[in-house]
Amino acid sequence: ILVPEKYGGSENSLTDAAVLYEELGRGPVPGPFFSSGILSVNILLQTANEKQKAEILPKIASGEYIVTPAITEPSYGWDKKYINLSIENNSLTGTKLFVQDGLSATHILCAVRSEKNKDSISIVFIDVNSEGIERKQLEGFLSASSEISFESVKITDDMILGDINTDQWDSLYTGILNSLPILCSYQVGGSQAVFDLSVEYSRTRKQFGQSIGRFQRVQDHIIEIVNHLDAARWTTYEALWKLESNMDSNTSIHLASAVSSEAYLKACDGGHTVHAGIGSLREYGLTLHTQMSRTLYHFLGDPKFHKRKIAKSLNF
């Protein structure tokens, strides 16, 4: 949806994408739609040269390529200092953790230390079927998070995006920032779905001869969900507006990310309190949101990470 027309995409706006992803979040619809169609596209637009864009983006738009970034490692963090995987003798050996949609991807955008300058970050475009790559699903209450291991994976200069002598960290980070409001929209959609489920259940579940929604304590939980939902929605809309209006949007994006991640998780907690036992049934659907909210809580930075970024931008 964000791929430019000259590369075979529809070149829609971020707001168009946000509307779509808010609806996908209501599902929540699984799959690499965000990882490949939003995040990877934005990273490629920032880091790849013209030849690489012309080769890769049309295949993402057509669905031939499913691409996902591999950034975090066992040291875990979303700042540059946490990237330790390094190109050595034109090969990679190491591990990337919490790679979203890593099992369904055909290619990965791997953030690594440059061989010539260890202070520099390079983005390497790697086919997952390359010799030396092993992928496995991470265990636990996670949605589509995987571990990717590299054992002497051969790296050539043409696999490195952009200028091989350029530090790509700032460009990578810009691609992430441009994608965050879309992720927030997905979380807003999920929070809205949890609210709708909770309100409907409070109307139809009877106890002591009346709907449980008449009890003040149940109303308190639903109001708390509403407060989180509204905070996430309006901070997300403001971030989108500022980003598309070419205003200074970094602080607003970090604020929306912190609020939306917290909102989705807290909305699910409140939803389970309203539903009680039935909410834990996989067939009911609430647990799908609960699992997704936990997965996305730390994806591209948890609320604590984004709050630190806000404080730094305010010179605290």
Predicted region positions:
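FAD-binding core of FAD-dependent oxidoreductases
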Residues: G31-V41, E64-V67, Q100-T106
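Solvent-exposed alpha-helices and their adjacent loops that cap or buttress functional pockets
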Residues: I60, G77-D79, Q100-S104, S114-K118, ...
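Flexible, small-/acidic-enriched active-site or ligand-binding loops
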Residues: W78, Y82-I83, F98-V99, D127-D163
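A short core secondary-structure module
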Residues: T93-I133
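A structural signal for short hydrophobic beta-strand segments in well-ordered beta-sheet cores
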Residues: L85-I87
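A short, Trp-centered hydrophobic/proline-enriched beta-strand micro-motif
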Residues: S62-P74
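Alpha-helical interface subdomain recognition
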Residues: I1-P28, T47-K51, K59, G63-E64, ...
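N-terminal glycine-rich flavin-associated loop
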Residues: V29-K51, D79
